[in-house]
Amino acid sequence: MASTTSRSARPARRNNKASGNTTPLLWMAFALLVVVLDQFFKIVIVRTFTYGESRPVTRFFNLVLVYNKGAAFSFLADAGGWQRWFFTGLGLVVGAFIVWLLYRHTGQKLFCFAVSLILGGAVGNVVDRVVYGHVIDFLDFYVRNYHWPAFNVADCAITVGAVLLIVDELRRVRKH
């Protein structure tokens, strides 16, 4: 039996690949740049600081060398070691999913920029977990005696990427 729905009555699918002139490889190269910057700064800190050492930079910011065996805010840091491989696997799964998203949504520049930042940050921290068994953190912001948990360039990239994803979605919703 023939369908009674006409072709023009179906909702138009957005062609996510047609707009823009970027490729997934460009976005992955940007993610690789994030990984390289993250690892560069971590290597500099590891070579010039001893564990736990803190050097003031401003009245609210120190450079430090600390290790995080857990996730954000040291979540599960004392879990006994299994978390290293759990978070490594999670980072790899998230990375693979993001690569798939980059192929699927290449023309959405802000979206791809955001997930490329997240990809670079995730891979940067996965490298630490595989090579060192923990993530190297070195940025310490504080107010008086309250210190925000130390973090690194990869964490910054993940956070900025997440904020940009929210901005991208809000812009997309506002258009409709």
UniProtKB/Swiss-Prot annotation:
Example GO molecular function: aspartic-type endopeptidase activity
Protein species of origin: Cupriavidus pinatubonensis (strain JMP 134 / LMG 1197) (Cupriavidus necator (strain JMP 134))
Subcellular location: Cell inner membrane
Gene from which the chain derives: lspA
Chief place of localization: membrane
Bilayer-spanning residue ranges: 26-46, 60-80, 82-102, 107-127, 147-167
EC number: 3.4.23.36
Protein keywords: Aspartyl protease, Cell inner membrane, Cell membrane, Hydrolase, Membrane, Protease, Transmembrane, Transmembrane helix
Family the entry assigns: Belongs to the peptidase A8 family.
Catalysed conversion reaction: Release of signal peptides from bacterial membrane prolipoproteins. Hydrolyzes -Xaa-Yaa-Zaa-|-(S,diacylglyceryl)Cys-, in which Xaa is hydrophobic (preferably Leu), and Yaa (Ala or Ser) and Zaa (Gly or Ala) have small, neutral side chains
Keyword Cytoplasm in record: no
Protein task: This protein specifically catalyzes the removal of signal peptides from prolipoproteins.
Protein name: Lipoprotein signal peptidase
GO cellular component, one term: plasma membrane
Gene Ontology annotations of biological process type: proteolysis
Pathway noted in the entry: Protein modification; lipoprotein biosynthesis (signal peptide cleavage)
Active site: D137, D155
Membrane topology value: Multi-pass membrane protein
